[in-house]
Protein backbone atom coordinates (compact mmCIF):
# COMPACT_ATOMS: atom_id res chain seq x y z
CA UNK A 1 0.00 0.00 0.00
CA UNK A 2 1.17 3.52 -0.74
CA UNK A 3 1.89 5.57 2.34
CA UNK A 4 -1.13 7.69 3.26
CA UNK A 5 0.02 9.44 6.42
CA UNK A 6 3.27 10.64 7.97
CA UNK A 7 3.60 10.56 11.75
CA UNK A 8 5.79 13.57 12.57
CA UNK A 9 7.96 13.47 15.69
CA UNK A 10 9.98 16.57 16.71
CA UNK A 11 12.77 15.53 19.08
CA UNK A 12 14.90 17.54 21.47
CA UNK A 13 16.79 15.89 24.35
CA UNK A 14 14.30 13.04 24.05
CA UNK A 15 16.46 10.13 25.22
CA UNK A 16 14.57 9.45 28.52
CA UNK A 17 11.26 8.92 26.74
CA UNK A 18 12.15 7.12 23.53
CA UNK A 19 11.94 3.55 24.80
CA UNK A 20 8.30 4.01 25.87
CA UNK A 21 7.51 5.85 22.65
CA UNK A 22 9.12 3.18 20.46
CA UNK A 23 7.15 0.45 22.22
CA UNK A 24 3.90 2.26 21.50
CA UNK A 25 4.90 2.61 17.83
CA UNK A 26 5.70 -1.07 17.47
CA UNK A 27 2.22 -2.05 18.68
CA UNK A 28 0.67 -0.27 15.69
CA UNK A 29 -0.27 -1.52 12.23
CA UNK A 30 2.14 0.38 9.95
CA UNK A 31 0.32 -0.44 6.72
CA UNK A 32 0.01 2.89 4.87
CA UNK A 33 2.08 4.74 7.49
CA UNK A 34 5.54 6.27 7.68
CA UNK A 35 7.16 7.88 10.73
CA UNK A 36 9.48 10.86 10.36
CA UNK A 37 11.75 11.97 13.20
CA UNK A 38 13.52 15.33 13.29
CA UNK A 39 16.21 15.83 15.92
CA UNK A 40 16.64 19.52 16.70
CA UNK A 41 20.44 19.70 16.75
CA UNK A 42 21.58 18.93 20.28
CA UNK A 43 24.75 17.10 21.37
CA UNK A 44 23.00 14.28 23.21
CA UNK A 45 22.33 10.62 22.28
CA UNK A 46 18.85 11.23 20.81
CA UNK A 47 19.91 11.16 17.16
CA UNK A 48 21.97 7.99 17.58
CA UNK A 49 19.07 6.26 19.36
CA UNK A 50 16.71 7.24 16.55
CA UNK A 51 19.12 5.87 13.94
CA UNK A 52 19.47 2.63 15.90
CA UNK A 53 15.68 2.25 15.98
CA UNK A 54 15.52 2.85 12.24
CA UNK A 55 18.25 0.29 11.54
CA UNK A 56 16.64 -2.28 13.84
CA UNK A 57 13.37 -2.15 11.89
CA UNK A 58 14.22 -1.98 8.17
CA UNK A 59 10.78 -3.35 7.29
CA UNK A 60 9.15 -0.16 8.61
CA UNK A 61 9.01 3.20 6.82
CA UNK A 62 11.14 5.33 9.14
CA UNK A 63 12.98 8.53 8.30
CA UNK A 64 15.44 10.20 10.67
CA UNK A 65 16.66 13.74 10.10
CA UNK A 66 18.88 16.04 12.15
CA UNK A 67 19.07 19.81 11.94
CA UNK A 68 22.36 21.60 11.40
CA UNK A 69 21.44 24.12 14.10
CA UNK A 70 18.88 24.39 16.86
CA UNK A 71 15.64 25.84 15.49
CA UNK A 72 13.23 25.35 18.41
CA UNK A 73 10.07 23.29 18.53
CA UNK A 74 8.24 25.50 16.03
CA UNK A 75 11.09 25.34 13.54
CA UNK A 76 11.22 21.57 14.00
CA UNK A 77 7.53 21.28 13.16
CA UNK A 78 7.98 23.44 10.06
CA UNK A 79 10.91 21.31 8.95
CA UNK A 80 9.00 18.08 9.48
CA UNK A 81 6.15 19.33 7.30
CA UNK A 82 8.69 20.04 4.57
CA UNK A 83 9.58 16.33 4.58
CA UNK A 84 5.96 15.19 4.15
CA UNK A 85 5.11 13.55 0.82
CA UNK A 86 1.95 11.75 1.99
CA UNK A 87 -1.64 13.04 1.68
CA UNK A 88 -1.96 13.50 5.46
CA UNK A 89 0.22 14.04 8.52
CA UNK A 90 -0.11 13.80 12.30
CA UNK A 91 2.11 15.28 15.03
CA UNK A 92 3.09 13.47 18.20
CA UNK A 93 5.78 14.38 20.74
CA UNK A 94 8.27 11.69 21.82
CA UNK A 95 7.60 12.18 25.53
CA UNK A 96 4.02 11.03 24.91
CA UNK A 97 2.83 7.75 23.43
CA UNK A 98 0.09 6.18 21.36
CA UNK A 99 -2.69 4.93 23.58
CA UNK A 100 -4.64 2.49 21.41
CA UNK A 101 -2.80 -0.13 19.30
CA UNK A 102 -5.50 0.33 16.65
CA UNK A 103 -4.79 4.05 16.24
CA UNK A 104 -2.82 3.88 12.98
CA UNK A 105 -5.27 1.41 11.47
CA UNK A 106 -8.26 3.60 12.33
CA UNK A 107 -6.59 6.66 10.79
CA UNK A 108 -5.67 4.84 7.58
CA UNK A 109 -9.18 3.39 7.20
CA UNK A 110 -10.66 6.87 7.62
CA UNK A 111 -8.33 8.28 4.97
CA UNK A 112 -9.25 5.46 2.61
CA UNK A 113 -12.93 6.11 3.20
CA UNK A 114 -13.18 9.77 2.27
CA UNK A 115 -11.27 12.99 1.71
CA UNK A 116 -11.22 15.54 4.54
CA UNK A 117 -9.31 18.59 5.75
CA UNK A 118 -8.93 17.59 9.40
CA UNK A 119 -9.84 14.60 11.54
CA UNK A 120 -9.84 14.73 15.34
CA UNK A 121 -9.19 11.84 17.71
CA UNK A 122 -9.90 11.16 21.36
CA UNK A 123 -7.12 11.82 23.86
CA UNK A 124 -6.06 11.11 27.41
CA UNK A 125 -3.96 13.55 29.44
CA UNK A 126 -2.01 12.17 32.37
CA UNK A 127 -1.20 14.63 35.13
CA UNK A 128 2.16 13.82 36.65
CA UNK A 129 2.41 16.53 39.26
CA UNK A 130 0.79 18.21 42.22
CA UNK A 131 2.04 20.95 44.53
CA UNK A 132 5.36 20.39 46.31
CA UNK A 133 6.56 18.34 43.34
CA UNK A 134 4.63 15.28 44.53
CA UNK A 135 4.43 13.07 41.47
CA UNK A 136 1.22 11.38 40.49
CA UNK A 137 1.48 8.73 37.79
CA UNK A 138 -1.32 7.71 35.49
CA UNK A 139 -4.15 9.95 36.63
CA UNK A 140 -6.19 10.05 33.40
CA UNK A 141 -8.27 13.00 32.24
CA UNK A 142 -9.96 11.72 29.10
CA UNK A 143 -10.77 14.27 26.40
CA UNK A 144 -10.14 17.21 28.73
CA UNK A 145 -7.84 19.14 26.41
CA UNK A 146 -9.02 17.68 23.11
CA UNK A 147 -11.83 15.38 22.12
CA UNK A 148 -15.07 17.19 23.02
CA UNK A 149 -16.99 16.60 19.80
CA UNK A 150 -20.44 17.54 18.51
CA UNK A 151 -21.48 15.92 15.24
CA UNK A 152 -23.51 17.42 12.42
CA UNK A 153 -26.37 15.41 10.84
CA UNK A 154 -23.95 14.12 8.17
CA UNK A 155 -21.58 12.85 10.92
CA UNK A 156 -18.96 15.50 10.25
CA UNK A 157 -17.67 17.46 13.23
CA UNK A 158 -19.31 20.78 14.04
CA UNK A 159 -16.00 22.59 13.88
CA UNK A 160 -17.24 25.85 15.44
CA UNK A 161 -18.32 23.86 18.50
CA UNK A 162 -14.95 22.10 18.44
CA UNK A 163 -13.07 25.41 18.39
CA UNK A 164 -15.21 26.72 21.24
CA UNK A 165 -14.74 23.69 23.46
CA UNK A 166 -11.23 22.34 22.87
CA UNK A 167 -7.74 23.60 23.58
CA UNK A 168 -5.26 24.49 20.89
CA UNK A 169 -2.89 21.55 20.54
CA UNK A 170 -1.48 20.42 17.23
CA UNK A 171 -1.16 16.83 18.43
CA UNK A 172 -4.04 14.38 18.08
CA UNK A 173 -5.38 15.76 14.81
CA UNK A 174 -4.91 14.36 11.31
CA UNK A 175 -4.24 17.14 8.80
CA UNK A 176 -4.61 17.13 5.02
CA UNK A 177 -1.18 18.06 3.64
CA UNK A 178 -2.40 19.98 0.57
CA UNK A 179 -4.97 21.86 2.66
CA UNK A 180 -2.33 22.86 5.20
CA UNK A 181 0.37 23.89 2.74
CA UNK A 182 -2.08 26.05 0.78
CA UNK A 183 -2.59 28.19 3.90
CA UNK A 184 1.17 28.96 4.14
CA UNK A 185 1.32 28.99 7.94
CA UNK A 186 4.42 28.81 10.13
CA UNK A 187 4.89 27.86 13.75
CA UNK A 188 6.59 30.18 16.22
CA UNK A 189 9.84 28.83 17.57
CA UNK A 190 9.21 28.43 21.28
CA UNK A 191 6.31 27.98 23.67
CA UNK A 192 2.61 27.56 22.74
CA UNK A 193 3.65 27.28 19.13
CA UNK A 194 0.39 25.44 18.42
CA UNK A 195 -2.04 28.33 18.76
CA UNK A 196 -0.91 30.37 15.75
CA UNK A 197 -1.62 27.37 13.52
CA UNK A 198 -4.46 25.55 15.28
CA UNK A 199 -7.05 28.35 15.13
CA UNK A 200 -6.50 29.20 11.43
CA UNK A 201 -6.67 25.59 10.25
CA UNK A 202 -9.74 24.86 12.35
CA UNK A 203 -11.55 27.94 11.05
CA UNK A 204 -10.57 27.23 7.43
CA UNK A 205 -11.37 23.52 7.44
CA UNK A 206 -14.44 22.72 5.36
CA UNK A 207 -14.72 19.07 6.36
CA UNK A 208 -13.74 17.85 9.82
CA UNK A 209 -14.18 14.20 10.79
CA UNK A 210 -14.11 12.42 14.13
CA UNK A 211 -12.11 9.20 14.44
CA UNK A 212 -13.46 7.40 17.50
CA UNK A 213 -10.17 6.01 18.75
CA UNK A 214 -7.81 7.11 21.50
CA UNK A 215 -4.79 8.72 19.92
CA UNK A 216 -2.16 10.24 22.16
CA UNK A 217 -1.47 9.73 25.83
CA UNK A 218 -0.26 13.24 26.68
CA UNK A 219 1.99 13.39 29.76
CA UNK A 220 2.06 16.71 31.58
CA UNK A 221 5.34 16.63 33.47
CA UNK A 222 6.58 19.10 36.14
CA UNK A 223 9.85 19.80 34.30
CA UNK A 224 8.50 19.87 30.75
CA UNK A 225 8.60 22.96 28.54
CA UNK A 226 4.85 23.41 28.97
CA UNK A 227 5.20 23.79 32.75
CA UNK A 228 8.29 26.04 32.95
CA UNK A 229 7.81 29.54 34.33
CA UNK A 230 10.13 32.40 33.35
CA UNK A 231 10.19 35.73 31.53
CA UNK A 232 11.59 34.23 28.33
CA UNK A 233 8.59 31.92 28.20
CA UNK A 234 6.20 34.85 28.70
CA UNK A 235 7.84 36.80 25.87
CA UNK A 236 7.45 33.78 23.62
CA UNK A 237 3.75 33.73 24.51
CA UNK A 238 3.43 37.28 23.16
CA UNK A 239 5.23 36.24 19.97
CA UNK A 240 2.69 33.44 19.59
CA UNK A 241 -0.22 35.88 20.10
CA UNK A 242 1.21 38.19 17.44
CA UNK A 243 1.57 35.31 14.99
CA UNK A 244 -1.95 34.10 15.78
CA UNK A 245 -3.61 37.41 14.92
CA UNK A 246 -1.39 37.77 11.84
CA UNK A 247 -2.36 34.30 10.60
CA UNK A 248 -6.06 34.87 11.29
CA UNK A 249 -5.95 38.04 9.20
CA UNK A 250 -4.00 36.22 6.51
CA UNK A 251 -6.59 33.46 6.10
CA UNK A 252 -9.53 35.86 6.44
CA UNK A 253 -10.83 34.47 9.74
CA UNK A 254 -10.04 37.18 12.29
CA UNK A 255 -13.65 38.40 12.26
CA UNK A 256 -14.88 34.92 13.19
CA UNK A 257 -12.32 34.67 15.98
CA UNK A 258 -13.26 38.00 17.60
CA UNK A 259 -17.03 37.74 16.98
CA UNK A 260 -18.55 38.07 20.48
CA UNK A 261 -21.37 35.72 19.52
CA UNK A 262 -18.85 32.91 19.05
CA UNK A 263 -17.22 33.56 22.46
CA UNK A 264 -13.93 32.18 21.16
CA UNK A 265 -11.60 35.14 21.68
CA UNK A 266 -12.97 35.81 25.16
CA UNK A 267 -12.55 32.19 26.21
CA UNK A 268 -9.04 32.09 24.78
CA UNK A 269 -7.91 35.20 26.65
CA UNK A 270 -9.48 34.21 29.95
CA UNK A 271 -7.48 31.00 29.72
CA UNK A 272 -4.36 33.02 28.92
CA UNK A 273 -5.02 35.18 32.00
CA UNK A 274 -5.03 32.00 34.06
CA UNK A 275 -1.76 30.82 32.50
CA UNK A 276 -0.03 34.15 33.10
CA UNK A 277 -1.37 35.19 36.47
CA UNK A 278 -1.63 31.89 38.25
CA UNK A 279 2.11 32.11 38.85
CA UNK A 280 2.99 35.81 38.62
CA UNK A 281 2.70 37.57 41.98
CA UNK A 282 3.81 40.80 43.62
CA UNK A 283 6.86 39.29 45.33
CA UNK A 284 8.10 37.93 41.99
CA UNK A 285 7.51 41.34 40.41
CA UNK A 286 9.46 43.08 43.16
CA UNK A 287 12.41 40.75 42.72
CA UNK A 288 12.53 41.18 38.93
CA UNK A 289 10.51 44.34 38.49
CA UNK A 290 12.24 46.00 35.53
CA UNK A 291 12.23 42.79 33.55
CA UNK A 292 8.70 41.91 34.61
CA UNK A 293 7.34 45.35 33.93
CA UNK A 294 8.81 45.30 30.43
CA UNK A 295 7.22 41.93 29.65
CA UNK A 296 3.83 42.90 31.05
CA UNK A 297 3.89 46.25 29.29
CA UNK A 298 4.53 44.44 26.01
CA UNK A 299 1.54 42.20 26.69
CA UNK A 300 -0.76 45.11 27.50
CA UNK A 301 0.47 47.10 24.50
CA UNK A 302 -0.40 44.15 22.25
CA UNK A 303 -3.85 43.90 23.81
CA UNK A 304 -4.51 47.60 23.36
CA UNK A 305 -3.24 47.66 19.77
CA UNK A 306 -5.59 44.83 18.81
CA UNK A 307 -8.59 45.96 20.85
CA UNK A 308 -8.43 42.84 22.99
CA UNK A 309 -8.64 44.44 26.41
CA UNK A 310 -11.81 46.37 25.58
CA UNK A 311 -13.48 43.38 23.90
CA UNK A 312 -12.63 40.80 26.54
CA UNK A 313 -11.80 42.28 29.91
CA UNK A 314 -14.20 45.20 30.36
CA UNK A 315 -17.27 43.03 30.98
CA UNK A 316 -18.06 41.35 34.29
CA UNK A 317 -18.77 37.83 33.07
CA UNK A 318 -15.60 35.79 33.55
CA UNK A 319 -16.89 32.69 35.39
CA UNK A 320 -14.25 30.44 36.91
CA UNK A 321 -11.52 32.70 35.51
CA UNK A 322 -12.63 35.75 37.53
CA UNK A 323 -9.70 35.52 39.96
CA UNK A 324 -7.13 35.49 37.17
CA UNK A 325 -8.86 38.19 35.15
CA UNK A 326 -8.92 40.42 38.22
CA UNK A 327 -5.23 39.76 38.74
CA UNK A 328 -4.56 40.76 35.12
CA UNK A 329 -6.45 44.01 35.68
CA UNK A 330 -4.52 44.62 38.90
CA UNK A 331 -1.15 44.18 37.23
CA UNK A 332 -2.21 46.36 34.32
CA UNK A 333 -2.91 49.23 36.71
CA UNK A 334 0.25 48.52 38.68
CA UNK A 335 2.55 48.49 35.65
CA UNK A 336 1.07 51.59 34.09
CA UNK A 337 0.85 53.61 37.30
CA UNK A 338 4.14 52.94 39.08
CA UNK A 339 7.66 53.53 37.73
CA UNK A 340 9.05 51.32 40.50
CA UNK A 341 7.91 49.23 43.45
From Swiss-Prot:
Regulation: Activated by the negatively charged lipid phosphatidylglycerol (PG).
Cellular compartments per GO CC: plasma membrane
One of the GO biological process terms: glycerol metabolic process
The enzyme's E.C. designation: 2.4.1.-
GO molecular function, one term: 1,2-diacylglycerol 3-beta-galactosyltransferase activity
Enzyme class: transferase
CDD domains assigned to the protein according to its UniProt record, in alphabetical order: Glyco_tranf_GTA_type
Miscellaneous section: The local lipid environment around the enzyme affects both the extent of head group elongation and total amounts of glycolipids produced.
Protein name in UniProt: Processive diacylglycerol beta-glycosyltransferase
Organism: Mycoplasma pneumoniae (strain ATCC 29342 / M129 / Subtype 1)
